[in-house]
């Protein structure tokens, strides 16, 4: 074996030389010729393969074009047959659904029914029969109802307008028929799901938009624009209705969301249902107090066989048609029921005019008929489901509902037909239905072939076959859900500056360009009610070419945006319990009266300087925070109390002398303390701001005790301590009994008292400040000589403590003027105040609160 291995090694040089000799016989032309042969062979095979693929592609495209034409013809034929079928049934088809009886209700109801008739047993010998296109028995299911409605959904794809609405009294099952339950969906989810199914089976491109609104007391509200709010929150204004040049109804500023699947519409529907107006009535604990309307718009640009490029279907849940005599409603419930019945009556008038083919149709008598104008007449398809109750207690409402349905039945056909004509019509409808089913089967086969060819084409070319259509920019409304901003508790920088350094209202208006001044960092004040964070949806039109987010930025509008909210101010009575649907103020104004309660200062012999400095600092702080004109807080408090005389503290009259004696006793125990009025300059007041929040804060009226503590610390005792020593017979000692009642939930008054808030054009009328009189000088003539020296002569005039500007006694002058004087005038001022307190304690003077004031508290 070793020899065999060594033999190739010895022959290796010979082998290499032989290979080199073989290479010497080859030339460069031979190499080029081999390369050319290889290139020609590959190009020929590639060309043959490309020719084969191109032939297949062309064949597939031809087949797709032929199938497209075939499907279009089938759609046109199906649309014609369906239109004939619906015309034979009538432009407005009226169904009746009988509510099943409960387990505890009567077993023998006065209502009997079959598949087409409803029989009302009025007495033992008298009965009345009502004819319908279809009567659904109490044991009928949601599937049975939708089976009759499905042809109308198909006509929507063909470009026809449609309207389906539920009619009947409250509690007969209208909402159940329209909405249903999770395990038994109603017409709304089934119709929308069927609409998307028809779109998927079609060979055209469709765009679907969803809108939802309600008609509450004659006003149109967009349910997708805002969630359910409290009565004090602003709601959008009533939407306006317009008619475009093509005769189509257009609702201005109505949010129109572009949707791509059923789940998106379902989410939007749940959002809209939360904003509906519902309330408790005698007929139902959760009664719908408005008409809920759902609009689904369908647009297809590349379908010439359609009736319209854009059509719509309305799904309407009408309000309860029960009489006010049954509900015994009052107040807001009465107004709601009246508005519902008026709109339903207008709907009946429109249907009656269509039945008689009058030249004038009264669409403008109600917002409901204006909105449904293009869905009730002409070539629209309308279905009305009348809901009745078989209970004997609801017999009157049942008869009213059946009479209304009779007016709407057979508008196109006119008079009732004979039995033979009706049998012939039913036979024709059966033939048309069979033809339509056959065409739909052929159309389904053609669509299946088209899908298979598209898959093959996608494998060959890498992209599917797309029907060429003009690509246009879509203007969509983007919904921005903006939560309420968190509260900003920081003080504004302008609050620490004097009034003359703060910007005026006119300068703010010039800088901002707005009609009113809005503070950029205004703080949010707490409301009287604990409210949840409200969410608002604002729309903006943005031109985009490609959709980024399906739900967040998918709405379509013709270059519109949602208008700003305006509303009305109204008092909320106990009857105004409707969810969200309360009137509120057009401009939210926050009125905050800040109260400063410094601790009482003990005026000892060695603390006069310290007390004076504290009072001076306190007055300076007040001067920086509050601006206004000179006024008397005591008379302002009197004026506010005289305005609130409508409140009753107790049924018993309070004796005025009793309070005067208590007040004099309390003043006798604090002889070293004084009280002064203040002179306030400036034209701004902290706490009065015009903001854009939805909540209002109204502080209770300041009591006399708080005014004394605020300005002069006249008494070291609290008012509750004083009142506790002098209990009133028959008067309970609680927080509510000590003070006059304040505004809670009864309403809100925008009245701003000029005396409190320092209006610029305020002029103090000191001649009418206080109704109290002091006949002290008439009783004690010897005091007339002493009081002018003390500067107290003017304070004893019939106006009590109300002093005129420029003539105030020294003890009632502002503290800022006292700070500029020397020790002598200051000592005289304190001496005068001491004399004044002594006179008050001895009973020679009073504070000006006469019997009229205390009598007014009990009126």
Curated annotation (Swiss-Prot):
It holds the Pfam family Kinesin. ATP binds at residues 168-175. SMART domains: KISc. Residues 518-530 have a biased composition (Polar residues). Belongs to the TRAFAC class myosin-kinesin ATPase superfamily. Kinesin family. KIN-14 subfamily. The gene is KIN14T. SUPFAM superfamilies: P-loop containing nucleoside triphosphate hydrolases (SSF52540). GO terms for molecular function: ATP binding; microtubule binding; microtubule motor activity. One of its GO terms (biological process) is microtubule-based movement. One of its GO terms (cellular component) is microtubule. PANTHER family: KINESIN MOTOR DOMAIN-CONTAINING PROTEIN, KINESIN-LIKE PROTEIN KLP-3. Keywords: ATP-binding, Coiled coil, Microtubule, Motor protein, Nucleotide-binding. Residues 422-463 form a coiled coil. Residues 511-530 are annotated as: Disordered. This is Kinesin-like protein KIN-14T. Residues 91-411 form the Kinesin motor domain. Signal peptide: none annotated.
